[in-house]
Amino acid sequence: KRNAVDHVSFDARAGEILCIAGIDGNGQTEFIHALTGLDKSNGGTVTLCGKDISHASIRRRGECMSHIPEDRHKHGLVLDFTLEQNLVLQRYKEPEFEKGGFIKKDAVRAYAERLIEEYDIRSGQGPVTTARSMSGGNQQKAIIAREVDRNKPLIVAVQPTRGLDVGAIENVHKELVKQRDAGKAVLLVSLELDEVMSLSDRILVMYEGEIVGEFDPKQITVQELGLYMAGAKRADKKEGETA
């Protein structure tokens, strides 16, 4: 039986946007689920902040990683929760928001109002708006605000602009670049060639569960990158050495 992901090995560096590019169904989802802890992996090692987190819980991985998931409804938000509840999903146990087993509602409200203003999250009833009633673009803004504000060294962003309008896409792109410029490592998974070429500092192409090429976006054309993504070309890890 073939593994969904096979011998994938790379480093994500501080201060860069590393993009994993590929056509849907070539192992990207399985890889990200193994990295973030949504699914267990059959083997291999994941090292983050100098620690082996290969068998760590999602919560422990979250100590060094923020995750903007591919499916914002399934993995990003609890749709029947309010906006403010969603904004503290990973942080409600922190002393800032909890004391003696009780949530500090005023602190949660103040935090939510700050993020709403800073990230221009638009919702009919402000912090108490049900997430389900918000537009896709504002749902995504909420997820990005929550994950970025956690201030972790690695940001994993999977299809962060899927289903968004042009204005929302531009906002997402600006935020990812801002985080890169602030010294974060940004791991971007995208199917969109234009997005890959415009945002990436380094590109890894995944095809049938393997990395088939590593490229500098300044040294490859959109057309050639498309050939690698479709499996028509293959390179060794070093740029330009075709196999």
Could you describe each region identified by the protein language model?
Residues 1-243:
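Glycine-rich phosphate-binding loops of nucleotide-dependent enzymes
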